[in-house]
C-alpha cells in the first residue's frame, strides 16, 4: 500500500538491486547465475508496483571489474597486478564481506557493461570507484573481444565467451588521489 500511495502522489521511489545483469538466469552467463533475477525489470515485481511505474534505470558499475565465485572473466588480472588492485578496491578491498575470500579483479569491460545496460534497459550509467585507479600509470579498457580470430563488440552470453580474448585501448592514468572530489573542476 505504501508504494502505491507514493505513486499516486507522484513521489519518487528508489529501488535498488544487487549483483549484475551477468548473474541473471535468463540473460547472464549460465550456469554462473543466481536463482532470482537482478534485472531492473524485476524490481517492479519485487516491489509490487506496475512495470510502467519505473521511469529511470540507472546502471551502476565500477571503474574496474570484479567477480565473486566461478565463471568467465575476460579481463581478469593475475599475480601482483591483481593483488594491488584487489587491495585498493572498494572500502575494504575486494574481499568477500563474510568469508574474506579474495575477489577476482580485472580491467573495465565496456562490452559486458554495454550488454548489462542494454538488458537492464538503463537510461543512465553511473561509474563508481574511479579513485581506486589513481595509482596507475596506464588504464586499460576492454573495447572488443577476439573470439576464434574475429573481433566483436557484441557480448556472447554463451560458452563462446570462454574463448574470448580482450581487445584493449590503453589510456594514461592520472596519478592523483581523487578521493573526496565532488565536482569536475577539482
Regions found by a protein language model. Name each.
Residues 1-186:
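Non-transmembrane, aqueous-exposed alpha-helical and coiled segments at domain scale
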Amino acid at each position: 500500500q505504501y508504494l502505491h500511495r507514493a505513486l499516486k502522489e507522484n513521489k519518487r521511489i528508489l529501488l535498488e538491486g544487487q549483483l549484475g545483469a551477468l548473474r541473471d538466469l535468463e540473460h547472464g552467463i549460465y550456469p554462473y547465475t543466481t536463482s532470482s533475477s537482478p534485472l531492473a525489470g524485476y524490481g517492479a515485481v519485487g516491489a509490487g508496483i506496475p512495470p510502467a511505474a519505473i521511469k529511470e534505470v540507472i546502471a551502476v558499475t565500477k571503474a574496474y571489474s570484479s567477480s565473486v565465485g566461478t565463471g568467465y572473466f575476460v579481463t581478469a588480472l593475475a599475480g601482483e597486478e591483481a593483488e594491488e588492485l584487489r587491495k585498493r578496491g572498494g572500502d575494504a578491498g575486494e574481499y568477500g564481506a563474510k568469508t574474506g575470500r579474495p575477489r577476482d579483479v580485472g580491467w573495465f569491460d565496456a562490452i559486458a557493461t554495454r550488454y548489462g545496460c542494454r538488458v537492464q534497459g538503463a537510461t543512465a550509467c553511473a561509474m563508481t570507484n574511479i579513485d581506486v585507479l589513481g595509482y596507475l600509470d596506464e588504464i586499460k579498457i576492454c573495447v572488443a573481444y577476439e573470439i576464434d580470430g574475429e573481433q566483436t563488440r557484441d557480448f556472447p552470453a554463451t560458452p563462446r565467451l570462454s574463448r574470448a580474448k580482450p581487445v584493449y585501448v590503453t589510456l594514461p592514468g592520472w596519478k592523483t588521489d581523487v578521493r573526496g572530489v565532488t565536482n569536475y573542476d577539482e
